[in-house]
A protein has these predicted regions:
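Short glycine-rich anion-binding loops that position phosphate/pyrophosphate groups of nucleotides
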Residues: 143-145, 211-212, 280
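Short glycine-aspartate micro-motif
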Residues: 65, 74-79, 135-139, 203-207, ...
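Short coil/turn motifs at beta-sheet boundaries
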Residues: 59-61, 133, 199, 208
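Short, high-confidence coil segments that cap the C-terminus of an alpha-helix
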Residues: 29, 135, 198-201, 271
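Glycine/GP-enriched mid-protein hinge/lid loop-to-helix segment characteristic of carbohydrate kinases
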Residues: 101, 170-266, 350-353
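ATP-binding/phosphotransfer module of carbohydrate and carboxylate kinases, centering on a glycine-rich
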Residues: 1-50, 55-99, 109-126, 130, ...
Length: 353
């Protein structure tokens, strides 16, 4: 499938404004190609140019950055669904602060789950929007084994009794808005992936806490996913005391489970850096130190030289990554395309005509 570079540019700008030169570098495209693409985003009002606030006056005119244009005509709804929270956020495109939010009632079936979401969307539309059609996409972040994105096939969910259901399709059929489903922990993995101070060139990440474990493998600053964008399912790793039970909550076998995970996975990808995060280790950092010392006693040079780094759970940035995902989903719906321009339009674009 051909890459839609207009969508790729928007997804980059969701997370951080940047210059055309930076886009050239990130997408490996020529200046003229990027200039043409950006023009196709500025004209419909999806992107705007802004001058950098900090620059050296001796260098002449300040550089211009590109940023997403705040747009109330394109809205999305983000659903955050886990054991301690079921909440809906109404978002305008390009604005990370929600228009509105509402706590929803925890339910245990997909039918009731969809009913709660349909009702809050109708409420948001009536109270805050000129029309319901302004909501272009729904993004759900939940604790589930799923094929992520628009496929949205859910095999099991820690909070819902239904199994093997096409959740995204069921929501679209019931609500009439395209839906994208993600594992809740995917947002945390994206937080780690995009953290400027972390080395994600070659690393594995384990997020442990609240009774669950999430695994991320980063190679060349990209996260590995399974078939149809499936989020890695690590709970079935054959640890004798139960892998998720031992790392999801601190207990007598947590140290052994962490060592097991590192020794089982790191050699497969020749990984030399492990990032450990989550509430399981917040008050037990000595466990990480002990595992690091145990690795240094290994004869295998890969394990001997492997470095473990602890990273606290950054809730605010985690939510921001989920918001960025909702913007990405909205772009999939908008599906921007190159607009062919006539000779007359091109002539009008030049000064003096």
């Amino acid at each position: 499938m051909a890459v839609n570079y207009l969508s790729e540019i928007l997804k980059i700008l969701h997370r951080k404004p940047c210059s055309q030169a930076e886009l050239c570098q990130q997408l490996s495209l020529s200046k003229s190609h990027i200039h043409s693409l950006v023009s196709n985003l500025i004209t419909p009002g999806l992107v705007e140019k802004v001058e950098q606030t900090e620059y050296n006056q001796e260098q002449g005119r300040p550089r211009q950055n590109l940023q997403i244009t705040h747009n109330l005509h394109y809205c999305s709804v983000l659903i955050v669904h886990h054991s301690w929270e079921f909440k809906a956020y109404l978002l305008a495109y390009g604005v990370t602060e929600e228009i509105a939010s509402k706590e929803l009632k925890q339910v245990n079936t997909v039918e009731l789950f969809i009913k709660e979401i349909r009702e809050v969307i109708d409420e948001f539309a009536e109270l805050y929007l000129p029309e319901r059609e302004a909501i272009k996409a729904i993004t759900v972040a939940t604790q589930a084994t799923i094929e992520q994105g628009s496929s949205g096939m859910m095999y099991r969910n820690n909070l819902l009794s239904d199994e093997n259901v096409p959740l995204a399709k069921m929501m679209f059929d019931a609500i009439g808005i395209r839906t994208f489903i993600y594992n809740y922990a995917y947002g945390h993995m994206l937080t780690l992936l995009h953290a400027p101070s972390l080395n994600t060139e070659n690393a594995m990440a384990l997020s442990c806490g609240e009774g669950s474990v999430a695994l991320g493998v980063f190679l060349d600053k990209k996260m590995l996913l399974g078939r149809n964008n499936s989020f890695p399912e690590c709970s079935h790793l054959p640890f004798k005391y139960g892998f998720e039970k031992s790392l999801g909550i601190y207990g007598p076998h947590t140290q052994e489970a962490l060592m097991f995970a590192i020794c089982a996975i790191a050699p497969i990808y020749n990984i030399n850096h492990v990032i450990v995060a989550g509430s399981c280790f917040d008050e037990h950092l000595d466990i990480i130190y002990k595992v690091q010392q145990e690795l240094k006693r290994q004869s295998d040079p890969l394990l001997h030289n492997l470095v473990i780094e602890y990273r606290g759970l950054e809730i605010e940035q985690h939510l921001n990554e989920l918001i960025y995902l909702s913007f990405d989903a909205l772009v999939e719906v908008l599906n921007p395309q190159i607009q062919k321009r006539s000779l007359q339009d091109l002539v009008k674009g030049y000064d003096g005509f």
